[in-house]
Design a protein with these regions (language model features):
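Beta-strand-enriched cores of mature, soluble protein domains
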Residues: 29-175
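Bacterial N-terminal signal peptides
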Residues: 13-23
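Bacterial N-terminal signal peptides that target proteins for export
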Residues: 2-15
Length: 175
């Protein structure tokens, strides 16, 4: 019986896939959508603690940077960054640093939102892009539910006027 089911699956899967592709061909043949545009969403000033060196791993040299707080503000959203998040940084052999931060925001009206922000920072030079990140937000449905359904690109730089180590991240909605 199991062999018969496997045989049916081997035959049925390509047929189903082909049918789906044929059915969607007219939609794919239409004009391509316009390229995305970016719209400013909000800016964060993220304060950082002292790096905790993990050491050399098979993937590169790992450091953990504590996120100690900060603020954020943009049209319709404002609040503080809850201390206790982390930025896991991996220094790669090509000189670039892969970052992946996981932290929480608290809006002025008390809503807590999770942020996972990742990107690569490469030394300036030929073929290097400016620091960009891609953020994913997890917010309760309601006033800030739009964060769950939007693609975000971030810019990253040192926050020059901060009282201690900090970065400025500007998030843009891809429209």
């Amino acid at each position: 019986m199991k062999n018969e089911i496997r045989a049916v699956r081997r035959v049925a899967a390509p047929l189903i896939a082909g049918s789906l592709m044929a059915a969607s061909a007219p939609a794919l043949a239409q004009d391509s959508p316009p390229p995305p545009k970016l719209e400013f969403a909000f800016e964060e000033i993220v304060t950082l603690g002292q790096a905790i060196p993990v050491g050399k791993t098979p993937l590169g040299t790992r450091n953990i940077i504590p996120i100690t707080g900060g603020t954020f503000e943009g049209p319709g959203i404002k609040g503080t960054i809850i201390p206790g998040g982390w930025d896991w940084q991996l220094q790669r052999s090509d000189g670039c640093t892969h970052i992946k931060a996981d932290y929480m925001l608290r809006t002025d009206d008390g809503v807590v939102i999770n942020v996972i922000n990742a990107g690569a920072l490469c030394p300036p030079g030929e073929g290097s892009a400016p620091p960009r990140t891609q953020a994913v937000f997890e917010a309760p449905e309601g006033k800030y539910g739009w964060l769950n359904r939007t693609a975000f690109i971030g810019t990253l730089e040192l926050a020059a006027n901060a009282p201690g180590p900090a970065v400025r991240i500007r998030f843009y909605k891809a429209m």
